Amino acid sequence: MADPANDRSEREEGGEDDETPPASDGNPSPSANSFTLSNAQTRAREAAQDLLEHQFEGMIKAESNDEGWRTVVEVVERNAVPDTQDIIGRYEITLDGTGDVTGYELLERYRRGDMKEEL
């Protein structure tokens, strides 16, 4: 009678790789589902439009951290003529590792024509 612990012929012939166990919860590893910079930019843009209800102007910063992503976006809070008098709001939007919004905060407001130091 063959010792199952020492009989590897069935596993080797079947082509199955039993060397690497599957994830304990059956889901792919986090690295396989990592939330990329491109995903973070898209999600922050959507969040800015949905949560702030203003016209998205642009993203000026996106950086990853241990919890997910920190982004800084600008939205047009008030249109004016001339457009140099538009009021721009600069917001920080934080996302977790799956892209869910965990918070947002107004950093500052300024007129488009004012010179601003970039973050």
Swiss-Prot record:
**Which pairs of positions does the record mark as disulfide bonds?**
none
Q: Which domain of life is it from?
A: Archaea
Tell me the protein family, please.
Belongs to the gas vesicle GvpO family.
Name the record gives this protein:
Gas vesicle protein O1
Describe the function of this protein: A minor component of the gas vesicle, also found in soluble extracts. May play a role in transcription and/or RNA stability and in GV assembly. Gas vesicles are hollow, gas filled proteinaceous nanostructures found in several microbial planktonic microorganisms. They allow positioning of halobacteria at the optimal depth for growth in the poorly aerated, shallow brine pools of their habitat.
Feature: compositional bias, Polar residues: 26-42
Biased-composition ranges, Basic and acidic residues, are: 1-12
Q: One biological process GO term for this chain?
A: gas vesicle organization
Q: Which GO terms describe its cellular component?
A: cytoplasm; gas vesicle
The further comment given in this record reads:
Encoded in a 14-gene plasmid locus called p-vac which produces predominantly short, spindle-shaped gas vesicles during all stages of growth.
Induction per the UniProt record: Maximally transcribed in late log phase, probably part of a gvpC1-gvpO1 operon. Has several transcripts with and without other genes in the locus, expressed from early- to late-log but not in stationary phase. Gas vesicles appear earlier when grown in static culture, possibly due to O(2)-limitation.
Where are the annotated segments for Disordered?
1-48
Listed under subunit, the entry gives: Forms homodimers, forms a GvpN1-GvpO1 heterodimer, interacts with GvpC1 (via the latter's C-terminus), GvpF1, GvpI1 and GvpL1, might interact with GvpA1.
Coarse class of the primary localization is: other
Entry keywords, A to Z: Cytoplasm, Gas vesicle, Plasmid
Gene giving rise to this polypeptide = gvpO
